[in-house]
Amino acid sequence: MIKLNPTSNPKNLIQTLSKDESFIVLQKLFRENPDLEKVICETALKVVSNVDAEKISNNLYNDLLSLDVDELYARSGNGRYGYVDPNEESWVMFEEVVEFYIGEMEKHHQRKLPHIVKEYCIGIINGLIKFSEEANTEFSEWVEDAPLDHIDYVIDCYEKTKPEAKDLDQIMSNVEEL
């Protein structure tokens, strides 16, 4: 068995583990110490529960703002597989960003954390509204209608999680004010 050098700092070893190595260590601890399950789950819940709609909204808005018209031009036009319409490709790029956030919302649904799912839904919708109202980039001109068009899609995804009626009503009342 390999041992840590007595002069080494154990914290340094732990802090320098890659994500994959950390995951392997956690799985091994979990298997070898079933009594740690509760502590590990509580800690994981604290980590994944650190979510709020405003932060999600701002992150989505910033991610959408970072979409680059030069990348759009590089991904569209004549190419090896034929012509790619820049209008269509701009929507594809927009949807790729939004889909990441919807995927996060669905991940929390799989974890059975409905309060976080609701925060994600609210955050995504607010981020789309903010982008629609405030974005003034060359790229945003290509997707003028996309933000508001995607709100219905976000709500459809949220409805698939079977939220409580009061939560859905709250989201719908916010959207109806548009």
Q: What residue spans do the PLM features occupy?
A:
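Eukaryote-biased, non-catalytic alpha-solenoid scaffold regions
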Residues: M1-N12, I24, R31, D35-L178
